[in-house]
């Protein structure tokens, strides 16, 4: 199945000059969504994953069905102030400024093998920050899985120390 056929391109969103890849059209097609999830699960099945992590927000949509299919737990990584209780934070640089991600301090046990799943790999900044949070808590990132990779943004280079897989490349 060619998953590119299920991605809608929206010109000039969220601002002029951006060619937005809308994954909601894939999510609403049951066969395409199942194929995407099954493809990621196939990539992960021999990696002894203990836990799947998904960054806010579309990482939740891709990560939870993958975790379910693998029979492991799912942990969200969120923007600041969205998680109750004690959190670990990681601040990272953006093109203009900084951003922060948070995870519960008790989300990962030392030595757990973690797969990070998200919808899109762009510059790699968010995924690198997610990996740093996992490692800060003692987890091992065994794979990073994406529905889409925007190759021209070179995010894979920033993640060269990790196993990276994407189903669709632009």
UniProtKB/Swiss-Prot annotation:
It is found in: Cytoplasm. One of its GO terms (molecular function) is AMP binding. GO terms for cellular component: cytoplasm. Its main location: cytoplasm. It catalyses: AMP + diphosphate = 5-phospho-alpha-D-ribose 1-diphosphate + adenine. Keywords: Cytoplasm, Glycosyltransferase, Purine salvage, Transferase. Pfam families: Pribosyltran. It comes from the Bacteria. This is Adenine phosphoribosyltransferase.
């Amino acid at each position: 199945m060619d998953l590119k056929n299920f991605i809608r391109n929206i010109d000039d969103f969220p601002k002029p000059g951006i060619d937005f890849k809308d994954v909601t059209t894939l999510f609403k097609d049951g066969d395409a969504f199942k194929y995407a999830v099954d493809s990621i699960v196939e990539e992960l099945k021999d990696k002894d994953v203990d836990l799947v992590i998904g960054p806010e927000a579309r990482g939740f949509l891709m990560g939870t069905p993958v975790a379910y299919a693998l029979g492991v737990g799912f942990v969200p990584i969120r923007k600041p102030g969205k998680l109750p209780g004690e959190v670990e934070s990681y601040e990272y640089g953006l093109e203009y400024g900084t951003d922060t991600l948070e995870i519960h301090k008790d989300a990962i046990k030392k030595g757990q093998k973690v797969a990070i799943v998200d919808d899109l790999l762009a510059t790699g900044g968010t995924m690198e920050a997610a990996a740093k949070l996992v490692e800060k808590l003692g987890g091992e990132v065994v794979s990073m899985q994406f529905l889409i990779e925007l190759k021209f943004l070179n995010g894979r280079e920033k993640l060269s120390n990790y196993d990276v897989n994407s189903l669709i490349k632009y």
